[in-house]
UniProtKB/Swiss-Prot annotation:
Site (Transition state stabilizer): residue numbering on this chain: K334
Keyword annotations: Acetylation, Calvin cycle, Carbon dioxide fixation, Chloroplast, Disulfide bond, Lyase, Magnesium, Metal-binding, Methylation, Monooxygenase, Oxidoreductase, Photorespiration, Photosynthesis, Plastid
Modified residues (N6,N6,N6-trimethyllysine): K14
Naturally occurring in which organism (per UniProt): Dianthus caryophyllus (Carnation)
Modified residues annotated as N-acetylproline in this record: P3
Lineage start: Eukaryota, Viridiplantae, Streptophyta, Embryophyta, Tracheophyta
GO cellular component: chloroplast
Residues reported in the UniProt entry to bind Mg(2+): K201, D203, E204
The protein's name in its UniProt record: Ribulose bisphosphate carboxylase large chain
Catalytic function, reaction form: 2 (2R)-3-phosphoglycerate + 2 H(+) = D-ribulose 1,5-bisphosphate + CO2 + H2O; D-ribulose 1,5-bisphosphate + O2 = 2-phosphoglycolate + (2R)-3-phosphoglycerate + 2 H(+)
HAMAP family linked to this entry: RuBisCO_L_type1
Post-translational modification: The disulfide bond which can form in the large chain dimeric partners within the hexadecamer appears to be associated with oxidative stress and protein turnover.
Primary location group: plastid
Annotated positions of the N6-carboxylysine modification: K201
Cell location: Plastid, Chloroplast
Length: 469
């Protein structure tokens, strides 16, 4: 018998399988300020106690495996293991529990969202003891937050770059999203910016397809931006989607955008991946580019109520990885989003400090210290009649983005942009005068129609549009 084997035998190593809860369920544990805390919605298989299910999540997302192993004796599990420290039943749901897990900070590589997610959600979601598992929220300790650079610029720097204050920013996604030539695409960009929008946008799946290669699109969009700026005296931008098949190609596209002198580029951060996103955010910070983030694929991850990951976790991850804008739902419009829950993660994006508030889906108090904020983008099935509600719900620090609600105007793209700008300015003025947008919104829009035929035409087209499914 080797000396190593004798040593292990002397401390009582016993091969075999034992319950996770014997090691990883620790209700007496007091969390540390440096712990990463996770709130999981756990649905155990029939016959699996919640303590065992919660402990299994803690084990399989940290140091545990299915059986005891010799090498456990070569490290300190008490220092490195995850701990399920509290369990509470979910009100109104049978056999669902919120299990709180604490992870020591040493388990995670500094400045790497990729590593954080690989550990916490990388393997445990397929665990047989669980019918379903959802990560509802994370508390990122300040010690870990400070290892990330975060958004390239943030809200205040963006406003200073654009010289635009006191109102939400206005955007438009160019439609049809696929099939336009680069020149016709640039024409639509110009018309929307000339009509009064601050930004136009590539759709998330516009990359570099045969009908419109990326370099041609970038050139025509830059021409459109420069022409609109010269005619309006306002700083304009178009979210040039730099997402590509490789990180090298993505950075090459961002470099070309910088050389053209445009203010902002775009990335699909979930399909592109967090490593690519963080790399692009670092480039944008170093080279004065704003970074717009689209959340394409998010509903694959976050839509199911008992499995996957809530968008507030993806939003926190984006603030760490880096982005100046991110799509965040609308509350109104065609895409799903509950008001209080949506405002909960909107505050997590913008504010320096957010208090725990379960009514808004916030499980932990979160401090971002000096990390810049991210502008939430409201987009998806919205039009001029929604403007009062959007202004009231999202406030000034937001981007309100109308695709079909601009390009679907009966008189064309520029009048569609005019209608949206007039509606926004009317709502901001009414709010500043003390009027209640929630109660008087339709009246405010109708009053503005009297001196804007473009707005009146838009209101007539979309007066009956509702998304009720």
């Amino acid at each position: 018998m080797s000396p190593q084997t004798e040593t292990k035998a002397s401390v009582g190593f016993k091969a075999g399988v034992k319950d996770y809860k014997l090691t990883y369920y620790t209700p007496e544990y007091e969390t540390l300020d440096t712990d990463i805390l996770a709130a999981f919605r756990v649905s155990p298989q029939p016959g699996v106690p919640p303590e065992e299910a919660g402990a299994a999540v803690a084990a399989e997302s940290s140091t545990g495996t299915w059986t005891t192993v010799w090498t456990d004796g070569l490290t300190s599990l008490d220092r490195y293991k995850g701990r399920c420290y509290h369990i509470e039943p979910v009100a109104g749901e049978e056999n669902q529990y919120i299990c709180y897990v604490a992870y020591p900070l040493d388990l995670f590589e500094e400045g790497s969202v990729t590593n954080m997610f690989t550990s916490i959600v990388g393997n445990v979601f397929g665990f047989k003891a669980l019918r379903a598992l959802r990560l509802e929220d994370l508390r990122i300790p300040v010690a870990y937050v400070k290892t990330f650079l975060g958004p390239p610029h943030g809200i205040q720097v963006e406003r200073d770059k654009l010289n635009k204050y006191g109102r939400p920013l206005l955007g438009c996604t160019i439609k049809p999203k696929l099939g336009l030539s680069a020149k016709n695409y640039g024409r639509a960009v110009y018309e929307c910016l000339r009509g009064g929008l601050d930004f136009t946008k590539d759709d998330e799946n516009v990359n570099s397809q045969p009908f419109m290669r990326w370099r041609d699109r970038f050139l025509f969009c830059a021409e459109a931006i420069n022409k609109a700026q010269a005619e309006t005296g306002e700083i304009k931008g178009h979210y040039l989607n730099a997402t590509a098949g490789t990180c090298e190609e993505m950075i090459k596209r961002a470099v070309f955008a910088r050389e053209l002198g445009v203010p902002i580029v775009m990335h699909d951060y979930l399909t592109g991946g967090f490593t690519a996103n963080t790399s692009l955010a670092h480039y944008c910070r170093d080279n004065g580019l704003l970074l717009h983030i689209h959340r394409a694929m998010h509903a694959v991850i976050d839509r199911q109520k008992n499995h996957g990951m809530h968008f507030r976790v993806l939003a926190k991850a984006l603030r760490l990885s880096g982005g100046d804008h991110i799509h965040a739902g609308t509350v109104v419009g065609k895409l799903e989003g509950e008001r209080e829950i949506t405002l909960g993660f909107v505050d997590l994006l913008r504010d320096d400090f957010t208090e725990k508030d379960r009514s808004r889906g916030i499980y932990f108090t979160q401090s971002w210290v000096s990390t810049p904020g991210v502008l939430p983008v409201a987009s998806g099935g919205i039009h001029v009649w929604h403007m009062p509600a959007l202004t009231e719900i999202f406030g000034d620090d937001s981007v309100l983005q109308f695709g079909g609600g601009t390009l679907g105007h009966p008189w064309g793209n520029a009048p569609g942009a005019v209608a949206n700008r007039v509606a926004l300015e009317a709502c901001v003025q009414a709010r500043n005068e003390g009027r209640d947008l929630a109660r008087e919104g339709n009246t405010i829009i109708r009053e503005a129609c009297k001196w804007s035929p473009e707005l009146a035409a838009a209101c007539e087209v979309w007066k009956e549009i509702k998304f009720e499914f």
